[in-house]
């Protein structure tokens, strides 16, 4: 059993669990400093540190321009791949079209970045958000981010690669797509009560 889970079961509070998670984050950052080379160390750390804020946006697409002024994707592509290869994050790519096949049908310059361990997202929240979680069990703007991160983590552990779809000329967006046999299955994550409008639109368009 993971130490974080054992700590919560034994004490029934988040306090000890959060301390363990924060130590894991510190260990991850130390690994980046130890194993990443040259300028990539700073860039990788910047990407890692910006994940919570980027997931808190309505549009959860990761924007390199928000990581550093004047930052360009081509300078950060290897940094994102490094984090993915290290097992620290899961990258979800935007499909060009919501249809099969998935390989070759996505834009590698449009993506979301989730933590491979959803608990680390909680541990990296700002102090105000941490206090709201402890006191009121309220995640505020991070609620949708956490729900998506949990689902993305589960899909990866089930053996799926992560893809989403966002139509450029409308608000239509589907959180995840998975392939089973010859079918493309949309997955919509809802952090609150409401209708799955995007999913219904996609399904109706195939009729």
Model segments located where?
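Accessory nucleic acid-recognition modules appended to NTPase machines
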Residues: 4-183
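Generic domain-boundary/flexible-linker signal
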Residues: 124, 187, 197-198
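General structural signal for secondary-structure boundaries
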Residues: 129-132, 195-196, 207
